[in-house]
């Protein structure tokens, strides 16, 4: 288990205690699906949020931010960017996104994501094919 994945599990465990099952995205999520090291530089976590995504005001985009921010603070992270909903601890960056934007953005339905449990921690992760659809949409969005 990589250090970043262990850190994700620590955060996801706290989210689970708040009734939140997070979606692990980005390179770290892809590592869990493929078993390959994609050299994740950060941790991308999606939770429930406004389906308007970037169109929604920063303060309203991520639901339960009023609970997530103090939880991250207790874990030693500092809130550094409201627009990206980014937290940092030393050289590690955690960014929160809204999972409700996924289907409109990439065609991937939240209902079709894979639910996993590792060390008693529940989280969602896309399949390899879903990651491909997400990365294709990202490349066209840039």
Predicted regions and their residues:
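Compositionally biased terminal segments of proteins
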Residues: 1-142
